[in-house]
């Protein structure tokens, strides 16, 4: 359909892995595949309806041609055939109109489902982001100068250094005064 080769597909997957990460990439792939399946289904519905409409139009044209040839001069067998064609054309028209009415409602429902699905996935993805990722996303939306980018990188390095010594579950930092009595006890034991 889009004439995408293996190399382009591989490049898209690598970029997706870098941008989304290994945790969110499968969710994004499933979401995109759902969209593609929905779009394919809608396209096949439209294609089938167009084919039926073309058949109906051809039948109507053949009926008009038969009427132009003076319907009374035809043999009784041909007149029966023309009547049958008219009846089948009318049946197809009513069936097509019913399907069109049903398709319009289902098309609107499918559009609403897609919108709801995209909103829910975007909400779950934002809920899954850690505060540092949200800060990073917020800062990447703005255009940053090289100096600002370097400053942000330094802040991130400092945060990593601090998080090594002060884990998230640790409410109070360990002060040097708490460490000194232990070293004095060790020195007393040596003496």
Curated annotation (Swiss-Prot):
A Gene Ontology BP annotation from the UniProt entry: protein transport by the Tat complex
Keywords from the UniProt entry: Cell inner membrane, Cell membrane, Membrane, Protein transport, Translocation, Transmembrane, Transmembrane helix, Transport
The keyword Cell membrane is assigned to this record: yes
InterPro entries documented for this protein: TatB
One Gene Ontology cellular component annotation held by this UniProt entry: TAT protein transport complex
Biased composition regions of type Polar residues, renumbered to the chain: 119-138
Bias type Basic and acidic residues, positions: 181-191
GO molecular function: protein transmembrane transporter activity
Compartmental location: Cell inner membrane
Membrane topology per record: Single-pass membrane protein
Transmembrane intervals: 1-21
Subunit structure, as described in the record: The Tat system comprises two distinct complexes: a TatABC complex, containing multiple copies of TatA, TatB and TatC subunits, and a separate TatA complex, containing only TatA subunits. Substrates initially bind to the TatABC complex, which probably triggers association of the separate TatA complex to form the active translocon.
Protein name, entry field: Sec-independent protein translocase protein TatB
Record organism: Pasteurella multocida (strain Pm70)
Taxonomic lineage: Bacteria, Pseudomonadati, Pseudomonadota, Gammaproteobacteria, Pasteurellales
């Amino acid at each position: 359909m889009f004439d995408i080769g293996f190399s382009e597909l591989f490049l898209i997957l690598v970029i997706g892995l870098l941008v989304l990460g290994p945790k969110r990439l499968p969710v994004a792939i499933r979401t995109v595949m759902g969209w593609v399946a929905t779009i394919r289904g809608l396209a096949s519905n439209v294609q089938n309806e167009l084919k039926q409409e073309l058949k109906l139009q051809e039948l109507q044209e053949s009926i008009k041609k038969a009427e132009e040839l003076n319907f009374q001069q035809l043999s009784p067998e041909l007149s029966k055939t023309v009547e049958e064609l008219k009846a089948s054309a009318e049946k197809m028209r009513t069936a097509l109109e019913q399907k069109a009415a049903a398709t319009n409602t289902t098309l609107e429902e499918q559009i609403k489902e897609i919108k709801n699905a995209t909103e829910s996935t975007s909400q779950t993805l934002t809920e899954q982001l850690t505060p540092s990722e949200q800060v990073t996303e917020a800062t990447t939306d703005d255009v940053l100068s090289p100096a600002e980018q370097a400053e942000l990188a330094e802040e991130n390095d400092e945060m990593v250094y601090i998080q090594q010594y002060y884990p998230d579950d640790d409410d109070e930092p360990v002060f040097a005064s708490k460490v000194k009595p232990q070293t004095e006890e060790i020195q007393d034991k040596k003496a």
